[in-house]
Amino acid sequence: VNSRCRRAAPALALGLAALLFPQQASASPTAAPDPVVFVHGWNSSGSTWDTMAGRFRAAGWPDDRLHQWTYPSGQSNATTAAALAAEVDRVLAATGAARVDLVAHSMGSLSSRYYLRNLGGTAKVDAWVSLAGPNHGTDAARLCGGPACTEMRPGSAFLQALNTGDETPGATRYATWASPCDVFVRPASTVALAGAENRTTACLGHTDLHRDAAVHADVAAHIG
């Protein structure tokens, strides 16, 4: 009898360990990242994000977490912000996620900021990124017409309202990237926001920021 007990003891000990410490019996699953909604700029489309989205995929981000949204860029940024609100709700419903990250290029920074500030976006957005965003205006917008371009001009009523008070409201984590060689959004200081992490890239053109590998790495670290 004693020999049988001795033989059964190791199995009994293993069974007790599994009951007492179940978390050690299986590895914890890796949480899926927040979905990313990419917001392009003026006279562009969602395809402008192909390079950056491809880098996210190569790093293991699932396709259903990457949304290259397209909208009519000539309309008012307030109109675009309302459409963005609907897109964010669609993505959250489709993925079951609690919040998204917004990654914006150029004028896309303005509609996404309007959404955060005025349409309840801070409750649904964990991290926000502005790449070469004319957050305080750019004189290059005087060379184009229509509501969107008018709103991008320094001193516009749209920008004055957007930048009055807290430029980075809510618990959303804000970050901006500006290039010293951007000839469309200048000076580079127009990109920075009070309360955000404001960074300067290498000498990149306006349409190169969202295609640059180093910028992608920084963006991934910020939203990750």
Label each residue range with its predicted role.
Residues S45-T51:
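The serine-hydrolase catalytic nucleophile loop
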Residues D34-H40, G60-D63, W69, G74-T168, ...:
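Serine-dependent carboxylesterase/thioesterase catalytic core
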Residues M52-W61:
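A short, Lys/Arg-enriched amphipathic alpha-helix followed by its capping loop at the start of a domain
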Residues E151, L159, E167-G224:
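C-terminal catalytic-base region of ester-bond hydrolases, centering on the histidine
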